[in-house]
């Protein structure tokens, strides 16, 4: 929180991963920062849940695919038990990983980072900088579970996105740009926009290839507006 940061106190981070090597790498990354410290580690979700029920952490770095209890199951328990520790999910760079990452946001995760493919990437600057940036953002937020509302699939009415008063919004667009924490924030905004919005909406979100498509598909399911991943030659229409 802000008081801890202003007093130069270190934020306590819990690291959860079934890979001993990745736990070690993530601990080294966190401990290299003068505002963070890796307080505890767990090798599966069940261990993590037990710790989170009894101890306080400023953020959790959580793997998805683990034995006994996976990351999505942990998030589901945290949500049901109103444990609001900010969670940063580590996701594989695959289609399945993209689905799991977007699902984790709906279950209350703050954001996600993609898992390194090998030890060279794990110890590289890109993974280190990305992980530290997201963890720093996570520990500074006020923990809320915006995804605790029921996520429903919206049935779009035929012609619902056609603007009857075309002149009113013909020269306007709504532009939204987001970075760390952005995918979760978009899930709290886009589904609440009306189908009769008088201007097209453009979203700019830095994500790995494939993840933007998955996010767009999920937002489309939840929203009255039609949402799609942009493609070359697309034309913005009211």
Regions from the PLM with identified roles:
Residues 1-3:
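Acidic, Ala/Val/Gly-enriched low-complexity intrinsically disordered segments
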């Amino acid at each position: 929180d802000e008081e801890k940061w202003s007093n130069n106190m270190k934020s306590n981070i819990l690291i959860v991963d079934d890979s001993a090597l990745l736990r070690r790498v993530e601990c080294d990354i966190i401990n290299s920062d003068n505002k963070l410290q890796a307080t505890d580690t767990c090798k599966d979700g069940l261990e993590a849940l037990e710790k989170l029920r009894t101890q306080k952490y400023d953020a959790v770095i959580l793997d998805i695919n683990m034995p006994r209890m996976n990351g999505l199951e942990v998030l589901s328990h945290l949500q049901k038990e109103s444990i609001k520790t900010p969670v940063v999910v580590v996701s594989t760079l695959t289609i399945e990983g993209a689905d799991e990452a977007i699902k984790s946001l709906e279950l209350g995760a703050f954001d996600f980072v993609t898992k390194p493919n090998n030890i060279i990437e794990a110890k590289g600057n890109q993974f280190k900088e990305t992980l530290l940036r997201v963890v720093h953002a996570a520990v500074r937020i006020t923990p809320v579970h915006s995804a605790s509302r029921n996520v429903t699939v919206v049935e779009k009415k035929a012609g619902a996105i056609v603007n009857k008063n075309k002149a009113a919004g013909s020269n306007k667009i709504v532009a939204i740009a987001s970075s760390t924490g952005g995918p979760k924030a978009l899930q709290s905004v886009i589904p609440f926009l009306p189908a009769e919005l008088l201007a097209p909406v453009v979203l700019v979100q830095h994500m790995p290839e494939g993840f933007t498509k998955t996010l767009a598909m999920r937002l489309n399911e939840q929203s009255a507006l039609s949402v799609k991943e942009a493609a070359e030659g697309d034309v913005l229409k009211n």
